[in-house]
Regions:
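Structural alpha/beta surface segment adjacent to cysteine/selenocysteine redox centers
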Residues: 57, 62-149, 153, 180, ...
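Alpha-helical scaffolding within the catalytic cores
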Residues: 47, 79-81, 175
Length: 224
């Protein structure tokens, strides 16, 4: 996973119970050395966030991710297809994305804005996938060229990206991550679905291999 280099103020001191491992200070730690799951003791807000899957699914997974993060791409390539096929498409899991663009990734925030704006054209997940698929091209080509390749209305997209409301959505995600001491990408919060637009659960850092990620899902579903 990749870590966000931000200090957490006193408002976040009792919100997240983290167990520390030897990888805690490594900015580029291997995916198999992430911290063990911890409990998020207060709630995330889900209203208006991009969601995949049924709102009636018994389990919700919230992802904090960065479009330039290599471990986030690994999750997209090696885990999400199986997750979608076995759990999202079958109505067992609802998958929700939140943005955590890290400050040293210059294209991450524009990519997050573009994806948010693709939702206006009902194409959020299409651009989400394209951005990860072409991650190595982000810096040299930019998000607009990638959006053009999947036939998005790029004029409309650019207008939306420049709006204050779009930046506010991303900054709200960043503030929420800081509040909950979520500093690494990708980070997942896995817990039972609720009807009040809020979420809490176990916090998992890193792009786990699919068998390990699947085991965590099955464990949560068996608790239900």
């Amino acid at each position: 996973w990749l870590a966000l280099g931000l200090g957490i103020g006193s408002g976040g001191t009792l919100l997240l119970q983290h167990w520390t491992s030897t990888s805690a200070t490594a900015p580029n730690a291997p995916a198999d050395r992430q911290r063990p799951p911890a409990a998020l003791t207060t709630e995330l807000l889900l209203a208006g966030e991009p969601a995949m899957g049924s709102s009636d699914a018994p389990l919700t997974i919230v992802e904090f991710s960065d479009f330039e993060c290599s471990y986030c791409r690994r999750f997209h390539e090696q885990v999400l297809p199986s997750l979608q096929r076995e759990y999202i498409d079958t109505g067992l899991v609802r998958f929700i994305h939140k943005d955590l663009p890290l400050p040293f990734h210059r294209q991450a925030k524009p990519a997050a804005a573009a994806a948010r704006c693709a939702a206006e054209q009902n194409r959020y997940w299409d651009l989400y996938s394209a951005l990860f698929d072409q991650q190595t091209c982000l810096a040299c080509r930019g998000v607009i060229e990638i959006a053009k390749e999947i036939n998005l209305d790029t004029s409309r997209l650019q207008t939306c990206m420049q709006q204050d409301t779009t930046q506010t959505l991303i900054n709200t995600n960043l503030s929420e991550a800081e509040l909950h001491n979520i500093r690494a990408t990708p980070t997942f919060i896995i817990g039972p679905s609720r009807s009040d637009g809020k979420h809490h659960g176990n916090v998992v850092e890193g792009a786990l291999p699919w068998p390990q990620f699947k085991a965590l899902i099955d464990q949560q579903l068996n608790v239900e």
